[in-house]
Amino acid sequence: MTTSFVSDWMAQEGQKLSDCKHDDPFSVLGIQPFQGKWIARIWMPEAEEVELLINGSLIPLTPPNHPWIFEALLDENPGSNYQVKVHRGGIKHQQYDPWSFRDEWMGEIDTHLFAEGNHHHIWRRMGAHLSEMNGVCGVMFCLWAPNARSVSVIGEVNSWDGRHHPMQKRMGGIWELFIPGLKEGALYKYEIRTQNGHCYEKSDPYGFEHEVRPAQSSKVSRIDNFKWSDQEWITKRDSSNPLDQPISVYEMHLGSWLHAPSDEPFIEPNGNKRTAVPAADLKPGTRLLTYPELKQKLIKYVKERGFTHIELMPISEHPFDGSWGYQATGWYAPTSRYGTPNEFRAFVDACHSEGIGVILDWVPGHFPKDSHGLAFFDGSHLYEHSDPRIGEHKEWGTLIFNYSRNEVRNFLVANLVFWFEQFHIDGIRVDAVASMLYKDYLRPEGQWIPNEDGGNENTEAVKFLQQANHVLFEHFPGALSIAEESTTWPGVTNPTDVGGLGFNLKWNMGWMHDMLDYFEVDPWFRQFHQNNVTFSITYNYTENFMLALSHDEVVHGKSHLLHKMPGDDWRKYANTRALLAYMWTHPGKKTIFMGMEFGQRKEWNVWDDLEWDLLGYQPHQGIQRLVDDLNVLYKSNPALWRDDFNQYGFQWIDCKDNKNSVISFMRRETLNNEWLIVVANFTPESHPNYRVGVPLEGFYEEIFNTDSDKYGGSNTGNMGGKASEKWSIHEYEDSIDLSLPPLSVLVFKYAQKKSPNEN
């Protein structure tokens, strides 16, 4: 190779590097063989002088072919055992050469599994990893961007200049670069040059931590230095069937549950004051609580209320508070609005120590168009479909994942494993499943593409959901996977091996709509709507249902639960108590949204906090007390939960008394043959002599009454219970003569004796 040819070639290579158009810097930079010797070739934009430091000796480098490519001829190959001394802009510094670290980070097996869509721990390769190469500490960066012309790491390390750290393209569209000396906390992005020359700055899709919005940089973060103390909890969880357990969920949004005054900063353990993250202009003078503060306040509150789980609306990093977290850009990081990843780990750990499980809302159905996120990631429609008829939700302004692409499915499935493994969560609630299952979801005719059979089912999304649930339960057999699926798609909670989607719970949207419609009707007209109350039992055993009164029902002009109820305040409170008690005694696991537990009046506002001042008023204290006691009643009586999904667990006594709007039923469980009788009166008229058939002779203890004065009721009841009489009704020989309070739910337990005074 002639000297002039080498000079021209190096000038061209240098120009490609300076233009950020190089995809193979390892072919040029670092230690290169040359005519039986070695050339040390260092890329150092805007440097004035560069020297090589090998074993204590300094070797001057010269830029013979390009002003930013510095070279020296060496007799021996030093490997990566050298440093570079740089003089630039009057500043001198010493560093290792990034292009001397050539070992592939993504091995052949990793690349193969990722291309198949089966690398369940891909985050251990992708992203930014604090690591050691050849005895040198630094950060390994790894990114999937197969259609990019070039990719650079930009950050504080290079003044956000993409010319300094071009990445090496590997097999499968993987880009890698080890930057020696970089430390935890360093901010970075990827600068991606597309094939047509456009340049984008992107956050790391696999980043483990990101800046607080509106900043968009990713942050180098450790994922392996938290000491968990919940192994007993995890072992017990994964060795039991959650469907056989009581599940009572408090759904909430971390940023609008409670705020703190902005002039009271959070004090870190080291004594430093943390910069406050403001709540919003709608709530001036306030700031968001941190994960440590939520650990102290929220866990105590949820435990006092008696809930078994907290469900957090999405906490994956997201740029816009108004999306409630449902439009994520940082899928592998808890949002930094509230603190650090390890602080969130400590929050989960503390939940487990108090016997509370943690469920996260997970949103694999779509993602936002923000320029720093996944959209048009490498200059192509990499994560989304290119055709907007299958790749865009016009109504939401978001993009739809391309589930047919193996690497995209891998990104999502591994993300699921990541949250369970890295943050010890106990369950997920998958948002908007119907939008994934149907190609024509919210689309007019002509704006969607049928599947290969001409139908509207999204077979790619079906396969993805099946894969995600299969992998989840393979790794975490005691997990909860809850579907928010609003249609009658069959087999949502059937196992994948029989063609189901593989969830183990599904929100019962039908029950929710029927009951809210029913309770919004004037009680005097409820006799014409009895079917709303009873219909859910006709399909109750087609899926494993969870009853949910969620955030979606208290926004966008729908009013909060209390204000959905008709009548004066007394009736509103009584109706609310009756609905909650019917929910807790109806088959199915339970979820309510924050604020419902004490009768919030205003609609939920993501920029405000709850109306905690209402707890200064007795009726709201009464509703909170009712929820506390419902959770005690629920957890202490297996008849209310053990056989939720077994037809033996429920039996109507009478569901046909629409004239009085009264229903009665039994809840039973097989293990101990325990059972309860529930009687509900959904009118404001009391019934002092209402007879209900019972299966056995004996005394029936009144163990719960929503009309108790401690809940704000009129304290009408049955003096602790009623003994049965030989009076045939409802196809039973025995019955009890009850006093039914207005707008109430009563629960009775068989005591096997004629009166409470008998021994």
UniProtKB/Swiss-Prot annotation:
Pathway: Glycan biosynthesis; glycogen biosynthesis
GO molecular function, one term: hydrolase activity, hydrolyzing O-glycosyl compounds
Catalytic activity: Transfers a segment of a (1->4)-alpha-D-glucan chain to a primary hydroxy group in a similar glucan chain
Keyword Repeat: no
GO cellular component terms, A-Z: cytosol
Catalytic residues (positions): 431 (nucleophile), 484 (proton donor)
Biological processes, Gene Ontology terms: glycogen biosynthetic process
SUPFAM superfamilies referenced in this protein's UniProt entry, alphabetically: (Trans)glycosidases, E set domains, Glycosyl hydrolase domain
InterPro entries: A-amylase/branching_C, Branching_enzy, GlgB, GlgB_N, GlgB_N_E_set_prok, Glyco_hydro_13_cat_dom, Glyco_hydro_13_N, Glyco_hydro_b
Top-level EC class: transferase
Entry keyword set: Carbohydrate metabolism, Glycogen biosynthesis, Glycogen metabolism, Glycosyltransferase, Transferase
This protein's record includes keyword Transferase: yes
EC number in record: 2.4.1.18
Protein purpose: Catalyzes the formation of the alpha-1,6-glucosidic linkages in glycogen by scission of a 1,4-alpha-linked oligosaccharide from growing alpha-1,4-glucan chains and the subsequent attachment of the oligosaccharide to the alpha-1,6 position.
Family indicated by similarity: Belongs to the glycosyl hydrolase 13 family. GlgB subfamily.
Subunit field text: Monomer.
Protein name: 1,4-alpha-glucan branching enzyme GlgB
Gene name tied to this protein: glgB
